[in-house]
Swiss-Prot record:
Function: This protein is one of the early assembly proteins of the 50S ribosomal subunit, although it is not seen to bind rRNA by itself. It is important during the early stages of 50S assembly.
Protein name, as recorded: Large ribosomal subunit protein uL13
The gene coding this protein: rpl13
Organism of origin: Thermoplasma acidophilum (strain ATCC 25905 / DSM 1728 / JCM 9062 / NBRC 15155 / AMRC-C165)
HAMAP family: Ribosomal_uL13 (MF_01366)
Entry's Gene Ontology BP terms: negative regulation of translation; translation
Keywords: Ribonucleoprotein, Ribosomal protein
Subunit-level organization: Part of the 50S ribosomal subunit.
CDD domains linked: Ribosomal_L13 (cd00392)
Family: Belongs to the universal ribosomal protein uL13 family.
InterPro entries according to UniProt: Ribosomal_uL13, Ribosomal_uL13_bac-type, Ribosomal_uL13_euk/arc, Ribosomal_uL13_sf
Tagged with keyword Nucleotide-binding: no
A Pfam family that the UniProt record links to this protein: Ribosomal_L13
One term of GO molecular function: mRNA binding
C-alpha cells in the first residue's frame, strides 16, 4: 500500500497519477486531501463548481460532492473506466482522507514528483473550495 500526501499537490495532476497507478493494481491511500490545490482564478473556479451543483434536481441528480476528500475521489473516479470490472476494482483500492488518520501517521508518506506547486499564482485549496460550496 502506498500513502501519498496531497499537501500542495495540483488536483488534476495528482488525480491522473493516482488513476494510472490504480489501474496498474496498486493500493493507494491519499492523506491531507483538503490541502490539495487547484490553480487558476479563485472566483472562476468557485463559480464553475457552483454551476455543477445547480445542474439537475435533488431527486434525480447528478450529485456532486462538496467535501475535499469526495471531490478528489470523484476526480480520480472520473479518470477510470467505471463501466468495466477493472475500473470498479481500481476505484475500490483507493482511499482518500481529509487529514492524516492516526493509524496511517506511522507509515511512510511520500510526495509525488511533478505534481507539487512551487511558484504558481492564483491557487485555491480543496478545503477552501469546500467551504465555499458549503460542504465542510
Amino acid at each position: 500500500m502506498r500513502v501519498i500526501d496531497a499537501s500542495g499537490a495540483i488536483y488534476g495532476r495528482l488525480s491522473a497519477y493516482v488513476a494510472k497507478r490504480l489501474l496498474e493494481g496498486e493500493e493507494i491511500t491519499i492523506v491531507n486531501a483538503s490541502k490539495a490545490v487547484i490553480t487558476g482564478n479563485k472566483e472562476f473556479i468557485i463559480e464553475k463548481f457552483k454551476e455543477r451543483l445547480d445542474i439537475g434536481s435533488v431527486r434525480k441528480g447528478p450529485y456532486y460532492p462538496k467535501t475535499p476528500e469526495n471531490i478528489l475521489r470523484r476526480s480520480i473516479g472520473d479518470m477510470l473506466p467505471k463501466k468495466i470490472t477493472k475500473g470498479k476494482e481500481a476505484l475500490a483500492r483507493c482511499r482518500v482522507y481529509r487529514n492524516t488518520p492516526p493509524d496511517i501517521e506511522k507509515e511512510k508518506v511520500e510526495k509525488v514528483d511533478g505534481v507539487v506547486t512551487d511558484k504558481v499564482s492564483g491557487i485555491i485549496t480543496l478545503g477552501d473550495l469546500s467551504k465555499e460550496l458549503g460542504g465542510y
